[in-house]
């Protein structure tokens, strides 16, 4: 077996590009090699800011061979009466690239045809890779591409060299004006190069030992963590690792060297969030804390070289960070000298969304919507909820959030505490943007949960009213995240809340607006949008698609109820008699769906006892009369597992009804009475789930 390596050398790529680049290279090479019939071990991909590497340690030097029988026209067309070949046969041979002497007769189920045997494969893998490599490189997707020089080729950053070796041979091709070879370049300081790689198997040794490059991202990450922990422990603390920043940092360096710096202890008067954000956002550095979780006057940064004078480099980093922290301290002191009243006045000059007014208007709507929500869910501190809604956006015009926009809400909560607001108000302001994503927690406080719901509902109503409905991947106002956030908060806090009523209230608080969609039409579209996202959320949480759709078809305005019904139905589906129950109740639902609309008499679920002539229908009627009070009581309590248990008890009776009674009797009165019996049953069933949607 042979070895292959491809290195795409570029100017520094953004760290955020590297994970997707590795995935694309692995998937595309794996697929291309399989399609070409080249057998090889799994494709290994590595990347640094200046290179993307594809390596295969065991590649078959020759393409897999096979023989294929290609069928041509029928023999009656291919041969003349005298047995010679017709022009049709000659054309077939020419098309297949074979001699006419290679044609033979092939008997099939459909008759006799002519055919040829074609030898497939057997090409040298290196020759196939000459076409595969440039095709893949040119098709790699990036969030942004650029041109350089005078050519039209585009890539994420200018391409500077290409190394492509199959064992000791160069895989010769050209991309973007760059021709492949056996030359690579190492770290700009520790092994700039050019470096010659004699054999594909030597690449990693050369780039590590001569080039001073750590090509594997996970190794760079581990080096940062191990070295950083050692330095922090020696200083009596521990590093505050942040995974997203750690991933970014390892993608910024080829030769990671952790470095512990110091900050003036006087800066520790700043809020923890401000200090960490200053370090992380501007300097790509990590904070250090003691065993009690208090910040220490240190920070950890990562260098891209081993410095000759470590103290000099450290002091340079300290000087730059000090300037950032001085700015933060200035904003902190300036903001504390202001007030929420001043900020709220300024919000009237900050546009929310075009025709939807100012951020000041939004806070006044949130004040009312939070108070309404508190009443709807039975929260006993509506005053705090309303106050949180009014103050929620004040920090947007503060100096600190102007500098560090990721601190919006967080700084509002900090300032609210410093300015004497109730703890519930301050906590709610700090939590208003939660959850920030699928892995982000929801607000922990009830006041924060209500403010977050109100904020998201207000944005959804406004955007849908203006026709700003997400399509495809485009969602500039993160409306999908808003919907999922509302659903998660309701589910995780167990709130009994009618979301349709919530959206209707949010629309009403806008008053008269120049909507592009009438509020009633926008509400319908918003309901559909919410239901689709809720469906995705339940499926992502591990529930079967059919169960989710059956529950949502029974109604999802009360999200808590939908979630509880789904959990109960999932448990019911694990019972041995589930399939039988579904078939029984689905039959009832389908009869009502099909026949109910065709009945001459409207079905209201009220049957007449004197028209119950068969024992089976009298038994069903008696069972329903006994079951309905229990059902309604359990429904009021929200005891859905017990409700599905009732259905299990009722199933044999319904089966007996179907076995012993002709529902569609020729007697119209009997037929309508029996349909009403089923309507009464289905009316209760349809509150739990749409059994007609289940497939068994």
UniProtKB/Swiss-Prot annotation:
The keyword Aminoacyl-tRNA synthetase belongs to this UniProt entry's keyword annotation: yes
InterPro entries per the UniProt record, alphabetical: DALR_anticod-bd, Gly-tRNA-synth_bsu, Gly-tRNA-synth_heterodimer
GO annotation, cellular component aspect: cytosol
Reaction(s) catalysed by this chain, per the record, are: tRNA(Gly) + glycine + ATP = glycyl-tRNA(Gly) + AMP + diphosphate
Per UniProt, subcellular location reads as: Cytoplasm
Question: Which UniProt keywords are given for this protein, alphabetically ordered?
Answer: Aminoacyl-tRNA synthetase, ATP-binding, Cytoplasm, Ligase, Nucleotide-binding, Protein biosynthesis
Example of a GO MF term:
arginine-tRNA ligase activity
A GO BP term, please?
glycyl-tRNA aminoacylation
Report which superkingdom the organism of origin falls in. Bacteria
Q: What is its EC number?
A: 6.1.1.14
UniProt KW Lipid metabolism keyword: no
Subunit architecture: Tetramer of two alpha and two beta subunits.
**Membership in a protein family:** Belongs to the class-II aminoacyl-tRNA synthetase family.
The protein's matches in HAMAP family, at most eight in alphabetical order, are given as: Gly_tRNA_synth_beta
Q: What is this protein called?
A: Glycine--tRNA ligase beta subunit
- Source organism of the structure: Nitratidesulfovibrio vulgaris (strain DP4) (Desulfovibrio vulgaris)
Q: Which gene encodes it?
A: glyS
